[in-house]
Amino acid sequence: MGNVEIPNWLKALPLAPVFRPTDTEFADPIAYISKIEKEASAFGICKIIPPLPKPSKKYVFYNLNKSLLKCPELVSDVDISKVCKEDRAVFTTRQQELGQTVKKNKGEKGKSNSQRSGVKQVWQSGGVYTLDQFEAKSKAFYKTQLGTVKELAPVVIEALFWKAALEKPIYIEYANDVPGSAFGEPEDHFRHFRQRKRRGRGFYQRKTENNDPSGKNGEKSSPEVEKAPLASTSLSSQDSSKQKNMDIVDEMEGTAGWKLSNSSWNLQMIARSPGSVTRFMPDDIPGVTSPMVYIGMLFSWFAWHVEDHELHSMNYLHTGSPKTWYAVPCDYALDFEEVIRKNSYGRNIDQLAALTQLGEKTTLVSPEMIVASGIPCCRLVQNPGEFVVTFPRSYHVGFSHGFNCGEAANFGTPQWLNVAKEAAVRRAAMNYLPMLSHQQLLYLLTMSFVSRVPRSLLPGGRSSRLRDRQREEREFLVKRAFVEDILNENKNLSVLLREPGSRLVMWDPDLLPRHSALALAAAGVAGASAVSPPAVAKKELEEGHSELQNKEKTSLLEELSLFMEKLNDVYYDDDDGLLNDFQVDTGTLPCVACGVLGFPFMSVVQPSEKALKDLSERQGETDAQEIMTLSSEKSDCEWKTSSRYIRPRIFCLEHTIELQRLLQSRGGLKFLVICHKDFQKFKAHAAIVAEEVKVPFSYDDVLLESASQEELSLIDLAIEDEEKYEHSVDWTSELGINLRYCVKVRKNSPTKKIQHALSLGGLFSDTSQMLDFTTIRWLQRKSRSKAKPSSTSSFTPCEHLEVKADGKLRDNLDSQTGKKEEKIIQYSRKKKLNPKPSAEQVQELATLAKSKDFDKTCKNFSSRSHLDSAIRSEMNSEIGDSGRVIGVSFSINPCSSSFTVGHGQEHPEITVKFGSDLDGNVTNSLSMVNGDSADLTLTSISREQHQGHSMTSNNNGSNSGSHVVASQTILVSTGDNHDGPRKLSGDYVCSDVSVRGIQEAVEMSDQEFGEPRSTVTNIEDEQQSQIVKPTQREAVFGDHEQVEGAEAVSTRENLCSEIILHTEHSSAHVGMEIPDINTASENLVVDMTHDGEPLESSDILSSSNGDEASSNGLQVLNDELSMESEVSSSENTEVIEAPNSMGEAKKKRKIESESETNDNPESSIGFIRSPCEGLRSRGKRKATCETSLKHTETSDEEKKPIAKRLKKTPKACSGSRQQEVPTTTHPNRCYLEGCKMTFESKAKLQTHKRNRCTHEGCGKKFRAHKYLVLHQRVHKDERPFECSWKGCSMTFKWQWARTEHLRLHTGERPYICKVDGCGLSFRFVSDYSRHRRKTMHYVT
């Protein structure tokens, strides 16, 4: 077998994570799994290796045979009289198909014959085996497939398995879903679990008796009579084997299997573990709350599937050969279903049918297809003695490497609550009955965390070890979900109770008419069975007498110890008392619309008479006549119950609200909101729980009245009809809101694509018609070429601006679908504004822009077209997020200029063109794409009006107005038309862009502008570059009169000689360069970052006739850029500022904050103020850093305040100035008591300085700052302490934890009980504290 070729895809599959809990962590399985869930759920599966060796084969077989004997349905086909007791422990297997039936046709490689690829045949074979028999058959099959090779590498067997899946079919047997367990029953633990298990079995037994059809001759079969032969045979052999069983138990006590069975990881108890959401499930369901056994052979496989209700699952391999697992993370479940639908079921099948087919657990496809589709998948090899945990919504598949015996059960951590509701809807859509109500389980689990007696009254302090802290975190998540659910129900309730005629009543399931009759019948049966035979009564009296004598012999100390153990059980582990306080078995009702078992609020709904008349017009003559008759005869009756078609139905509150909106135009509906009587008990604790988890509890109290007898009858009728006529046609199916009816129709008639009227997570959507945004090529219109003007006057290309802001490509594109955002487009402009062009003018130019002649005349313009195309093609490959990706192409030329906005899904392209008419007036036009409107307001520039004071004509006829003297921010709304303002939905925090250069970059003379340059500045001039706060991000475009008022500045401030680009963001680092290009055009490169991610540089081309561009470039500084980021930037830079710049900076920040708060409200709804409206001119920059630091008042240029700017540091500037700049300063860094923590905001820093933890969900307060610093190890998982024992590599967060760990190596037991006569010693203080609490060994 050494020549087996391992596929490359199999070699590349990553391994799932493996965890090794310590003895302390192993004590609480739910707490430990909750701890690793964040890391492990990213893979969908993980392996946990317990700190105990695997159990022996003898121990496993003994417990499994003992468990199989308790299932009489497994031995129904065996003649008990002919076999011994061990041979009666049998199980049945299921035959599986592995391979493909391929029929080769001419010209084709092969096709699957009569069945789709990936769907395998699984059926009952009828084979009955004992463990020894099936093991022998498995070994024989192994030899036929692999020969005499005993051990093969797991990857080799995996390659052989997937190779066999593509070849001629072979048939394997697999004993799956066998009720039972190979764990031994724990001793003196989980007493309440065994009691509930008996109660659950009794519930199923009563249900079977009530629903069991009559046997032969019309007589009901009696379970007692059927079990009599088996019971008598068992009793006859019980005495002979009793001593043998006792010897085996004594022999196995203390072994690895015995220790594991008596731990919390015993799968018989995992579903009922403290902290598991499934702990309070009322029924005992095999495979969910009780484990099932899986006995396999070589290549026995289980199909791709998720667990019932998408719960967690825990699997333990007791003995035998390994198993291989493959899993897909839960985040890719929808993608996985789509790949399976297209490649295995065919594209004609819809999403719901594919989901149903996957639920049948017959789909076996290779992970190669999954990985090839871009979906991550991992593999895992489970060896005997190891646990495998799968997480909610994670699809997994696997197979066995030989004979083995495994076991599995379900449970749920608090994280399952995030998917519980959607999982219930998907289960109902697959036509499966719900097994649980996630709301009821949440409420009961929360109540189990609420102590009925304050824990402070318990003797002895609680331990603060890791297990207790994990328990507190687990309780926090559950309690917070509990409060949020109650508030959400209250919100829905408030909406419904505002409707006229609404009513809320409290109902008791025990008071329903039908339930009362059944209760009386059950009481009569119980009374008849209460008469015990004399022998049984005598035996009970003797047992009671002996028990009394034993109690008399019990010492006072033992009684106190027993009392404390029971008290601790009540507070922490025992839940029998809690179950007695609430009605667990009744009170959950399924919603017609979604199939979810609702609790505690539901509603009984019926259409109004007007709505019924509207429905009658759509029905046949018989139904319409019946509806009209009922409407006329019983018009005085509010509820109509005689017709099955219009019978009242049960809905959850959420879908009652949706149904009310749906029928609002048809006459509305009648509804009765019903509240379970236990809700008052839950609500009594809600305010206290909300205070514990720090959630505001704003609850609107409503009046709860007890339901009248008529209302109870109405509720009972609705429940009874749900059971009898769940698939029949009625008004809910007519409206398309009956989920089970929709599923039934789609299953029976696949051609009928019936749709559900309410939103159910897209289950009824046709995914084949959904857009795949990853394959969309975002269009970018090319720049217009230069046009040949008919006028004799010549023009020179003046400006070409191209801005590109790119964000990180996200994987989840559909989450951004539907977001309409305002984009910020920045362009250069002159100060003087013209009135807004008329609508006719815009429409005329838009028509002209679309004409072919216009395209031909402009195709030769722009020498930079090849650069534009390259940048646009690069942008097309990178755009993927509508919220963060903006592509803007902006150009201005005498004939036509346009800019293109490329962004997300809503508007792939928006083109706006500027044209110059023969008179020189710049006009605007707008081109709409995909039929969507884009509101845009641009400014027009009149050269005639501007020429007198800001523009001149040079000798060669070119327009000197091409100088960039200011920058204006324009907000373009790409959404629908709105009358009011809308806030920007993105996270862009963009300042007004002011362009300031140095004298070397742009040099303009005073004579060129027709007026002298002013050197007088004031404080207001310094504040023109403002930060755009979130409240200022409103895109409303009005007339230009509103803008002109905000842009009124002196003429001297418009004519700036320098350009600076400011981009305000919390983490933006901006750099600018202007390389040397010809005088006709200059290339400006801007480097930006957004949220810590680098944005690609975009080219900004500005031309100035006669201007010179410095190769050193423009230096840009963010006003709030930290000193640390300046020093650690990629280029060696330093901050150059005046000696009193720190004081000026503080004053400037204060003035900025005041100007922002006192700003005119109208300024937030018009154009953003240009930074050039108040720019001050400043002096030339000195050549060296020494001269740049000097402040000379005699020079006019040096009298101006020196602005803070970023400058390349020459090598000569490495003196004392660099030492003065702190290299590790940070605006939000803590320096208390040696603390060096940094924070995102000043608010968190202030909270931190108050000795309070800023981690989300924590908020703990400490009496000293050093304790807060140490506390951060909990959240950062820092482990600075290492075990000093040679060969041990364990690390610890705390010194005391390492000290206690060292006692495991040294054997030290320092804690000794000081009570006389005890003398027990303990290694850990927690064990000593527990001993004192249980035995009351306190020494005063």
From Swiss-Prot:
Tell me what gene encodes this. Answer: ELF6
Q: Which organism is it from?
A: Arabidopsis thaliana
Q: Which residues are in the JmjC domain?
A: 262-428
Q: What is this protein called?
A: Lysine-specific demethylase ELF6
Which family does the record claim for this protein?
Belongs to the JHDM3 histone demethylase family.
Keywords in alphabetical order:
Activator, Chromatin regulator, Dioxygenase, Iron, Metal-binding, Nucleus, Oxidoreductase, Repeat, Transcription, Transcription regulation, Zinc, Zinc-finger
Compositionally biased residues, Basic and acidic residues: 217-227, 1188-1201
Ranges for domain JmjN come to 16-57
Any GO MF annotation of the entry? zinc ion binding
Q: What class of enzyme is it?
A: oxidoreductase
Reaction catalysed by this enzyme: N(6),N(6),N(6)-trimethyl-L-lysyl(27)-[histone H3] + 2-oxoglutarate + O2 = N(6),N(6)-dimethyl-L-lysyl(27)-[histone H3] + formaldehyde + succinate + CO2; N(6),N(6)-dimethyl-L-lysyl(27)-[histone H3] + 2-oxoglutarate + O2 = N(6)-methyl-L-lysyl(27)-[histone H3] + formaldehyde + succinate + CO2
- InterPro entries according to UniProt: JmjC_dom, JmjN, Znf_C2H2_sf, Znf_C2H2_type
